[in-house]
Amino acid sequence: TISPTIAPTVSPQLVSARDRLRPQAAVTFSDRLLSAPLFLTRERRANQDVVATIKRQLQLLLPGVSIFLDVDDLESIDALESYVQASQAMLVLLGSSQYFTSRNCLRELAEAQRLSLPLVRVHDADAAKNGAPLPSLRTAASRRLQRQDTTRLFDVGAAQLPIIIPWLRIGHFQQGSLASIAEQVLLASPACVDVASVPLALKGGLAWAEPTFAQPVALFVSQLNPAATEPAHELASALAEVGVSASLDAATHWLLFVSPECFEGEQGQQLEAQVQAATAAGRRLVLAWSPEACDDFKHVIEATPHALVSAGLYETLAIEWRGGVHRRVSVRLAAKALGAQMMASSGGTCEGA
């Protein structure tokens, strides 16, 4: 298995997303990086489990890759900087704010900044796992780092800075995180010095599956639920068999985007009545929500009128509508909810279909 949280029906394999072949760069990368490892840095007491998992999964996905993790490889704390100097890149786990109060973590980071090592930035926001929001981490960093170092560690969108990769623990989403980490690790290797991108896929992974529909789908979006408009049109753009309907009667499904605020006020009351009527009429509702806007679905449930909860509105799981590298997973989860079969690109049914 790729992770304790992933149980695929076939052994996943990292392949080029362009041609579905094992990336040749990985072979050269592994051979040339053995003496220049990927250095993993994190707050040792709070975020050890995450980096241990990342190391284990990268070794499965990129056979032969050399990865330095102090609990496995450190011989002398006094020589910490020399280990950074011997590395090709550094993976920084942005999790606990205690990272920026640790003398040794700051030593590692300072040496990487001095050497201008490529940084693979991975963010764990899960507070239950000692994670924290990026703005809080940036504030903590700004107290201990120079402005340019804080900028390099947290800025996004600049051409020279790759994205900050969210670390998620749910299987299909974690696959997206791992593939993105592997892409950035490859791009930091000598083998890819002149390569702009190396899009990768996990063979059999949901994010790279091709949804197929037996019949066309028409999605209704209520004017009382404007948050559903953009996801509905994105689904219609991504999935050829899906369209958007202004009429509930003409639609096959209703996409309802729920949040703690969606049933508030007069408009929310009207939406509640509309949902009640649709539920009573046996309409097929597909629910979605944003974990990036609301960190716990229980807040959505608590804010939902009791009558809707009692009527079974949440008997079917709401789709996590995520952005960035995880959007492909959200789109395919929505496609499954709309009746699609997930076909692996190499043929056969995708895991989790």
Segments the model singles out, each with a brief description of its role:
Residues 1-60, 64-66, 123-242, 250, ...:
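C-terminal interaction surface of TIR/SEFIR-family domains
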Residues 41, 113, 182, 277-279, ...:
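Residue-level recognition of well-ordered secondary-structure positions
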Residues 52-56, 63-114, 232-280, 328:
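TIR-domain catalytic/interaction hotspot
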Residues 73, 96-98, 115-130, 170, ...:
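Short beta-alpha junction loops
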Residues 77-80, 106, 117-124, 271-272, ...:
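Long, compositionally biased, intrinsically disordered segments
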Residues 86-89, 115-119, 159-162, 251-252, ...:
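Short glycine-/polar-rich loops that comprise or flank the Walker A/P-loop
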Residues 109, 255-256, 275, 285, ...:
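Polar, glycosylation-prone regions of secreted, cell-surface, and some intracellular proteins
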